[in-house]
Amino acid sequence: MAEGGFDPCECVCSHEHAMRRLINLLRQSQSYCTDTECLRELPGPSSDSGISITVILMAWMVIAMLLFLLRPPNLRGSSLPGKPSSPHSGQDPPAPPVD
């Protein structure tokens, strides 16, 4: 414990709060279970929401491929055979005149 009896960890996770959560969980589960049976599927949003991480990753890959294929010509690595790759055709620029 810290000085003065103040425990900063208790602000984040106190035993009373954990017990309240446990009691609420037990109360909620009791409403779905009877003496003879306990429902396996609890009411509420289902875990199978129709969209999975695989679908999201495939969508991102399609977007990345489209952006790659539709990039502007100045960002493409290769150039046309007749077109020079730089303004000086690979040569050093001329030296400035000496006065």
From Swiss-Prot:
Which organism does this record belong to? Mus musculus (Mouse)
What Pfam families does the database record attribute to this sequence? DUF2615
Which biological process, per GO, is one annotated for this protein? blastocyst hatching
Keyword Transmembrane helix among record annotations: yes
Per its UniProt record, what PANTHER family does this chain match? SMALL INTEGRAL MEMBRANE PROTEIN 14 (PTHR31019:SF1)
- Span list, region Disordered: 77-99
Taxonomic path: Eukaryota, Metazoa, Chordata, Craniata, Vertebrata
**InterPro entries reported for this sequence:** Uncharacterised_CD034/YQF4
The UniProt entry's GO CC annotations, sorted and at most eight, read: endoplasmic reticulum; endoplasmic reticulum membrane
Segments traversing the membrane: 50-70
Protein name, as recorded:
Small integral membrane protein 14
User: What subcellular locations does the record give?
Assistant: Endoplasmic reticulum membrane
Q: Keywords on this record?
A: Endoplasmic reticulum, Membrane, Transmembrane, Transmembrane helix
S-S bridge residues: none
